[in-house]
Every structure is written in structure tokens, then in C-alpha cells.
Curated annotation (Swiss-Prot):
Free-text comment about domains: The large coiled coil domain is required for homodimerization.
Skewed-composition ranges (Polar residues): 1-20
Keyword entries, A-Z: Coiled coil, Cytoplasm, Cytoskeleton, Membrane, Microtubule, Nucleus, Transmembrane, Transmembrane helix
Name recorded for this polypeptide: Zygote defective protein 12
Organism in which the protein naturally occurs: Caenorhabditis briggsae
Chain spans, region Disordered: 1-33
Residue ranges that the Swiss-Prot or TrEMBL entry lists as coiled coil: 244-405, 436-692
Regions that span the bilayer: 732-752
SUPFAM superfamilies: Hook domain
Primary gene name: zyg-12
DNA-binding listed as a keyword: no
Amino acid sequence: MLDLTNQESDSSENGNSKYADSTDGRGIGTSRRLDDEDLDERRKDLADLVFWMSGLKATTLPLDDHTSLCNGRAFAEILHEIDRSFFDERWLETMPEMRTSSNLVVKRSNLRKLWRKMSDYIQVLNRKVVSTRWTEIGDRLDGLDETDIPVAADLAMAVVSLAFIGKTQEKYIQYSQELPAGEHQHMMANVARLVQIVMEELPEVPTFHEISELDGSQNELNSSHVESSVITNGNGSAERRSTLSANDQVLVEAQLEIDELRSERDNLIKDVERLTKALESSQLDTSTCSEPNELSILEKQNEELRVKRRQAEERVLELEASMEHFQAIVVKLTDENDTLQSGQKELNMLKTHLDTAQSDVEEWRTIANKYQSDAEMLKKREKEVKELQGQVKSLTSRLEHHVKTATIDEDNKAGIVQLRSQIGTLTANNVELNVGLESKKRIVEQLELQLIQYKEKVKELEDRKEDLIAERNELENKLLFKESVTPRSLHESMFEAGHLSFDDKTKLPLEIENKRLTERIQELESLEPLKGEIIKMKSQNGVLEEEKLVITKQMEELERQVADLQEKLTKNQQHASGDVVELKVQLEKANVEVERMRETEMRTEAKLAGVEELLRKRNVEKEANETALQKAKAVIDELESRNRPVGEDNKTSVQDFKELKTENELLRQKNEALETALNTTTQSLEQENRLITSAAHQQILDRSSDSMMIMRAQAGSDHPQTLLDTQKMTRALPWRFGISSMLIIFMVWFFINTFCEVNAPPKA
């Protein structure tokens, strides 16, 4: 078990020597690294203290990690378990539980708050700190084992010692006695030694109840009492410190005077006893003494002793009267001291609240300065945005100029010249083909005329042939008829016809027929070359017909090409006019986007104006809080200067304290309202930032190549098919789109950075 009277604690002077390494010559903590041996010893001490604290089960935080202990939250929860009335829930809420261990500023602030509260508790316990072990303990943290382990060990020593000297010390003494003594005996002995060291460094302050006898000037004590209680001036905290130091000085002087009076009383009592014994012995020896000189000497000595005894008795009576008088004064001063201690406790609580409010005011002041710098930065960036808008206008005008000059003048002219050269070439080819066609047509017409003539001749020959055939048939019929008639009649007819002889008359038809047949044969023989020529003409006519068909097809192809070229020319002209219209539409859309960005800028300016208005309100409230803080400090100084019992000067100091508490509560509510308004503003700014970011990303996506093709299709133009469309798509539009995209991306980046800086949380 833990024994505070252990003999091992006698070596506290030697055991305390290792702690001198963590302080400099003035006793102020430094971050000088310890040796490995000293560091291991401090780690062992911390482990023993952690074992004792872990049995309390006052916290769920890890106690075996010195980094977590240096946050201060675990020690605060253990102190809350030790004395719930002093280390209350409200104070415990001011010690945040950190999720990260790398923020040294917050850790140092937590340790300073923790030690201030522990110092107040030590004063409440009527003790004082005479060691420099905990001086500026928060500033000794450097995030290293060589600095953090000694700090954690010193705080653990103080926390465990407060458990043994606090109001609930019986509970923890009983707890220490119930711990197993066998396996942890050395650990408990080490804890007892450390607690003994701390108790020597936190001695009790002597009170007036310890004063038994007082001697000296009553006026000096009364004047000291009057000087400590009456208001001498209104200089605030400086007078308060001088008054407290004067009270301590009076107490020390009174204690010294009491010790002197005690020693003087003891000496006088010893002298009285010695003289009494000498008197008794002298009376016994009177009978034996015969010399008158010796008797006279003894009588003189006896008389002197009686006088001294009488003086001593009178002195004792005076001292008893003074003691009774001073006992009444001591009782009165004790009551005043109790009242002052209670008032000091309330003042300490009020100081804590005021320190918290002052730190909050400093944080708000830092935030206000940051917002003011952000507002100035926003104004500068607003000027930059205006300059960029002017550049956008100039770029837009240059874009229109380049689109009109480069796209219409160069591309359209080059395409039209090329098309005209193609049309000229095709027209020349068409003229040549038309000339050839005309010559071929004339040849065909001549051949057709010759063919018609030959056909007429053939028709005439065929008619002649038919006539000859009909005549031959008629002659044959006649010949047959003549053969069928009588010879007389035939003879007569032949005689009548030519007065020929009978024999000649029979030969004449045959000769005629023979002659006719010969002529017919000659005619037929003369028709044979004509038939060959007819066949030849027919073959030539067929060839010419085929050439005519080929030429006709070529003419149709040329006409189709001319029509296609004319159609392409018409489409190019339509595309040129349509692209100009499309560019105008895109410019209108760009203007709409610029207007939208202007509206966004106006909204941002409105938000900025709101933030500036909020900053102005925060500044006004900050000034009001500072004014209230100054008033509270003045009231505190006045109350501390009036540290006297209630009703002594017909005023109620408790009522003033209540008023200050009420005012402090109002200030805390104002701070909470300001925090709520700040959180609301931050959320609205974050929402606006997200909306602007999403709108900017949507605009960037809308300006992609796919969306441009969709916009082109919606505008009524087809995909690029001509040289002009290809040149426009590859030259005119991409660089304009690139400039617009870069401008939008820059503005989005600007707004994102601006709102991120505005919404950044304040650094501790």
C-alpha cells in the first residue's frame, strides 16, 4: 500500500536531484534534452504514477501514452473525479479532447489552463507552490520524448498529490491501502516517494489559528490590518497584488513576533523558576549564614528577584491581556480570512471565465483581422476580375475580328477561288465536249441525210422491183394465156402485131421477155453495190448511234457535275452565311455567359458586402465585449480592493459578484450567438462555393467538342462536308474555344481559392 511515512522518503533530497535537469538556473522549465538514464528514470516514475491513476477508472483515454497525457484532457477527467465540486463539468468542457497529437499550440494552451486550475485548487487547500517544477510547464512541450515525458511526469505527480491532500483524501488513502502490496510494493514505494516530494514543494500556509501568543505593538498590527482592508487607491490589479503581498508580509512578521514572544516567555519562566529555587535555597541557608554582609546581599538579591518576579507577573498579565485581545482579533481576522478565501475562490472562477472570454475575444479579433485581410484581398481580386473582364471584352472583339477576317475573307475567298477554277475547268471541258458534240451532230445529220437519201433510193428500187415483179407476173400470166389460146388466134395476133411470119411471131414474146429479164438482171446487179453501201451506212449509223449515246452520257455527267458544283457553291454560300449566324449565336451565348458571370460576381459582391457587414457587426460586438471586459476588470479590481466581509461598508459584495456573473453569462451567450452566426455564414458560403464550382464545371462540359457539335446541329447546320467547313472547324473555332475555356477555368480557380480562404477555420 501507499505509505506517506515510508523511510524511503527520507531520500527525497537525493531523489529530487534528477528533476533539476528539466529547469535552468532560475527554475524555469526548458526543452533541454535529458540523458538516457534520467529519461528512463522519468519514464519509470510516469509508469508508476499511471498505474496508480489507472485504478481510479476516471477516464477512458489511454494513460500509457505520454503524448495523449500531454493533451491535458486525461488529467482533467482524473481531477474531476478527485473533486467534482471544484473541477466541475463546465470547466471540464473547456479542455477539448484532441483527435490529433501534432498541434503543439493547443496542447500548450490546455496545459496552461490545467495548471491555472490546479494552482487555484492548491490555494483553496491553503497551500502554496515553492518549487519551480511547474513554472511555464506548457511552454516546455516540444513534441519530443525528451521534453514531453518529464512534463507528463510532473503533472502526474501533482495530480496524485492533490488526491492525497484534497478534500477527499481519506477515500484515496483507503484506495491506496487496498492495492496489492506484494507484487507492486516497489511501485507503491516509488509513488509514495514522489508524493512526499510534491508535498514538500507544496507546504501549508500558516493561519491565524496557529498563533497562540502575540507580543509587540498593537498599533502596528492594527495599522497593518487597516492597510490590508481599507481602499487606498483605485489602480486595479497592481494595488491588488500589493495588498496581497502586504497581507503575506504581515502574517510572516506576526509569526516571527509570536516565535520571539514564545522564546522570551520561556526564558522568563526559566529565570523565575531559577530565582525561586535560589530564593528558597537562600532562605534555608539563612540560619546557617552568620555574616551580616551575606545576609544583606541575599536580601538585596531577594528584593531584586521579587521586583523581577513582580515585573514578570505584570508582563505575563499584560501578555495575557494582549493575548485575549489578539485572540479576539485573530477570530475576527480568521472570519475575514474565510470570507476573503471564499471571495478569492469566486474571483478565481471569475478570472477563469474572464480569461476564457479574453481568449475568445482574441480569437475573434484574429478572425476579424483575417476577414479584414480577406476582404482587402477580395477587393484586389475584384479589381483583377474587372481587368480580366476588360481583357475578355478586348479578346471578344479580337475574336469577332479574326472570325470575320480569317474565316470569311480568307477561307471563303480561297474556297470560292478554288471552286471557280474548278468550275472554269469544267466549263472549258464542257465547251470542248459541246464543240465535239456539235461536230458529231453535224456528221450524224449528214449521215442521216445520206441515210434518208439511200433509204429513198432503196425504197424507189424496191418499188421498181415490185413493179418489175408485178410486170413479170403479168407477162407470165399473159404468156400462159397465149399458150392456152388457139394457134390461129396466136398467129393472127402475132401477125397483126408485127406482120411477122409465123415463126417470128412465136419468138417475139420470148425475146421480149428475155430482154426484160436481162434488164431486170442488170438492174438487180446494179442494186448489189447499193445494198453493200446500205449495209455499210447502217453499220456506220450504228457506230454513230453508239457514239451519240456515249456523248449524251458524257453530257449528262458533265451537266450533273455542273449541277453538283452549283449546288456545292450554293451550299458553301449558305454555310458561310450560316456560320456567320452561328458565330453570332455563339457570341450571344458568350455574352449570356458573361452576363451570368457578372450576376455571379454581383452575388459574390453581395456576399462580400454581407461578410463586411458581418465583420463590422463583429467589430462592434468585439468593441462592446472589450468595453464590457474592461468594465468587468474594473469591477474585479474594485471588488478585490474591497476584500472585506459583507456588510462592513454597508455594501453587498456578493451582489456585485452575482451581477458580474450575470454579465459574464450574457457575454458567453453573445459569443455563442456569434459562433452560430459565423457557422451559418460559413455554411452559406460553402454552399455558394459548391454551386459556383458545379456551374463552372457544367459550363466547361458544355464547351466540349461534343456539345459544340450538338449546338451546331441544333443551330440547323450539318456536319462539315466542304473545305470551308473543315477549315473553320480546324482553325477558327478551337482557339476561340480554348481562350474561353481558359478564362472560365481561371475564374473558377479564383472563386474557389477566395471562398476557401474565407471559409478556412481559425487557427488556435
